[in-house]
Amino acid sequence: MIQQQTTLKVADNSGARGIMCIKVLGGSNRRYANIGDIIVASVKSATPGGVVKKGEVVKAVVVRSKKGVRRADGSYIKFDENAAVIIKDDKQPKGTRIFGPVARELRDKEFNKILSLAPEVL
């Protein structure tokens, strides 16, 4: 469960290292985001020379969550960390590489470019 003030690791090479959730998109008073949901976040730490700078406000999609998601067969998929990928307004990732595994649930939300760049889809 990602909510306001939650810090997430960035799982791409856009230049950001860590972000903090400002808002969960999808409703006027929506509180929690899970895998596949879009959030608005502030960049808290960034690598020098990256596309994204510290202090920027960006949109990101959650790709890993400690809370996890329940699948149709009754199983749960959970990760060791909360991670997100920074995206543009057209749902395409800003970076050109994705680090770490991502969940298959991103396919339902039509983030196919992220799935094709990811080294492992669970």
From Swiss-Prot:
Keywords: Ribonucleoprotein, Ribosomal protein, RNA-binding, rRNA-binding. Pfam families: Ribosomal_L14. The keyword Ribonucleoprotein applies. GO terms for biological process: translation. Gene3D superfamilies: Ribosomal protein L14 (2.40.150.20). One of its GO terms (molecular function) is large ribosomal subunit rRNA binding. One of its GO terms (cellular component) is cytosolic large ribosomal subunit. It comes from the Bacteria. Binds to 23S rRNA. Forms part of two intersubunit bridges in the 70S ribosome. InterPro entries: Ribosomal_uL14, Ribosomal_uL14_bac-type, Ribosomal_uL14_CS, Ribosomal_uL14_sf. The lineage of its organism: Bacteria, Bacillati, Bacillota, Clostridia, Eubacteriales. Belongs to the universal ribosomal protein uL14 family. This is Large ribosomal subunit protein uL14. HAMAP family: Ribosomal_uL14. The keyword Ribosomal protein applies. Part of the 50S ribosomal subunit. Forms a cluster with proteins L3 and L19. In the 70S ribosome, L14 and L19 interact and together make contacts with the 16S rRNA in bridges B5 and B8. The gene is rplN.
